[in-house]
């Protein structure tokens, strides 16, 4: 499902070297399912975009490092969403942009590029996508839905909001002491 969403929303705000919606999907997938699934999702989205949308290999080089590091940073921080965002920014904005240079210069024959040509665009796109992902995931966390998604997907749940609400829940009604029913 994440692959389908990633492919469908990828044309939004997309110019060569910038695809903020891809970073939104990478971070969300990393938090929901972990680094390996996020890496697989980024690879599948990149290949589909390259095959059917004519996107250059930037679809892969600009996604896989950030997707994986986003999940690694999220797990290493024991569930801090901001660390997942920083993992995406570092992985895509720095590593992905530097790897993109030889791919585009030597394999695709692009001229006039230097090693940092894609860095400003990649960092800008990851910041935009990272902000969107952070807002989205924080909203899910505050409502307890993030933990429910993670549980249903079989991922490790780090969400403290979920644990607090589960501890204070009335076993008969399922509502916490602070709950309001409207």
Language-model-detected regions and their locations in the chain:
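Loop-helix junctions at membrane interfaces
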Residues: 1-182
């Amino acid at each position: 499902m994440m692959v389908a969403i990633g492919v469908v929303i990828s044309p939004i705000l997309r110019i060569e070297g910038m695809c903020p919606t891809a970073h939104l999907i990478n971070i969300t997938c990393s938090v929901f399912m972990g680094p390996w699934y996020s890496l697989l999702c980024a690879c599948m989205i990149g290949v589909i975009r390259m095959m059917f949308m004519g996107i250059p290999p930037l679809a892969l080089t600009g996604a896989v490092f950030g997707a994986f590091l986003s999940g690694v940073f999220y797990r290493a921080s024991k569930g801090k969403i901001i660390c997942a965002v920083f993992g995406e920014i570092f992985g895509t904005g720095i590593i992905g942009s530097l790897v993109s240079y030889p791919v585009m210069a030597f394999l695709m024959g692009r001229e006039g590029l230097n090693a940092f040509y894609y860095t400003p665009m990649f960092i800008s796109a990851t910041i935009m996508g990272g902000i969107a992902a952070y807002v989205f995931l924080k909203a899910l966390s505050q409502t307890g839905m993030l933990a429910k998604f993670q549980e249903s997907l079989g991922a490790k749940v780090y969400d403290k909001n979920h644990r607090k609400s589960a501890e204070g829940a009335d076993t008969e009604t399922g509502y916490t002491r602070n709950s309001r029913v409207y």
